[in-house]
């Protein structure tokens, strides 16, 4: 007997996950297309209140082993849902996909953008941002709104990346690109951290504490505040990392912007004589700007 995708999806929204949720979880664009062509609402919530786009992007959390997240098929599934009108900001106030665990209450929860940031795929982050996903919102913990802890796409994405690498200097290229895209989209680099053990550390301070050297200049260029050392909050590891030679150079220079400006001037002095006979003089600063990570080292 043939199964009606629309009827199956409507039943699943009440009784539990079947084809629609599985198609979203696995990023199966063709299966999703069949449901949508049959008239299923693109923002139909599952029993836990998640929309297909949230599920496809991993807003429920890091995908378990066995799920292939970084695939062209998943990108196609996300693009399909957005093309059919899925809310890129599902999970936020006045949007579908809010937490419905508590009777009579709708609470903000992880958005598709947060899910893509956690799972570390820059392509899906870019697709969502182009579709209107907001990088700025910070939401309270839906399971404990009084805790005072908040979440943002930049925060959860960097936290996930730095924890995967144990603070290694070489954060993977996807996570670096994600952070850069979110900062350019207006994400707050000084937002509170998501980890309770971190106390009142901002994201900038948390990145220093865990030792994420590669993302420090990215956050600083985006307006990250470099707190004085020692921080006087009992985080001995933070104080150790805060004394890193790179950060000490910024202190001596008077801050990142001053250091960046001096770095630019040094490189211009070196390269201007070499390029002025090849290109107009006014283009040399642009070449330096796009060829080097000014202030990053």
Enumerate the language-model features and the residues they cover.
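Cullin-RING E3 adaptor/co-adaptor recruitment helices
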Residues: 206, 217, 222-225, 230-297
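N-terminal segments that cap or nucleate solenoid repeat domains
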Residues: 2-55
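Ankyrin repeat boundary signal
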Residues: 42-45, 88-92, 104, 135-139, ...
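Ankyrin repeat domain, specifically the short helix-to-loop turn at the C-terminus of the second helix
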Residues: 33-41, 79-88, 126-134, 180-188, ...
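Start-of-repeat signature of ankyrin repeats
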Residues: 16, 49, 95, 109, ...
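Acidic/polar low-complexity surface segments
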Residues: 59, 92-104, 141-145
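Ankyrin repeat A-helix N-terminal signature
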Residues: 22-27, 55-74, 103-107, 115-121, ...
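Ankyrin-repeat and related helical/solenoid repeat scaffolds used for protein-protein interactions
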Residues: 171, 176-184, 188-230
